[in-house]
């Protein structure tokens, strides 16, 4: 199973011409069924997609509609066990806490890959490998 980071969701809704190729790739990723997200990813999506300084902000209802659609994927809760695992990952790999929480949620959801533009492509974090789906 593959875990989807927030940036994939944000690119999938982009209407910016400069992001058209990434938007198409992100939409293709999300057309798969064998994906997982976390509550953190959905929260980050909501905050970033409705931010008024964004070139194409969504309304509350629009963002909510996307979030409801993505509930078809496995959604990993953020539990104390995920928090503990994230803190251990942060200490071991020197990642930001938020990236560590993504890796921990992916591992807890039995994912072998995290699809993300924001982390090191190809890096393995204890059995979870980062894959940049936008890399040529």
What are these regions (language model features)?
Residues 10-14, 49-53, 71-74, 90:
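Short amphipathic alpha-helical interaction patches enriched in hydrophobic/aromatic residues
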Residues 36-40, 116:
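Substrate-recognition element of Asp-dependent hydrolases with the DxDx(T/V) motif
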Residues 1-37, 52-61:
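Short, well-structured N-terminal submotif of metal-dependent ribonuclease cores
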Residues 41-42, 62, 82, 102:
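Short, conserved alpha-helical segments within structured domains
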């Amino acid at each position: 199973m593959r875990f989807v980071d927030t940036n994939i969701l944000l690119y999938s809704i982009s209407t910016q011409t400069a992001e058209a190729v990434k938007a198409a790739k992100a939409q293709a990723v999300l057309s798969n069924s064998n994906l997982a997200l976390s509550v953190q990813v959905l929260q980050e999506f909501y905050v970033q997609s409705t931010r008024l300084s964004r070139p194409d902000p969504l309304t509350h209802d629009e963002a909510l509609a996307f979030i409801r659609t993505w509930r078809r994927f496995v959604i990993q809760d953020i539990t104390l066990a995920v928090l503990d695992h994230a803190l251990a990952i942060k200490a071991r790999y020197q990642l930001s806490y938020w990236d560590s929480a993504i890796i921990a949620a992916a591992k807890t959801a039995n994912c072998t890959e995290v699809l993300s533009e924001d982390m090191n492509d190809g890096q393995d974090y204890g059995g979870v490998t980062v894959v940049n789906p936008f890399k040529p």
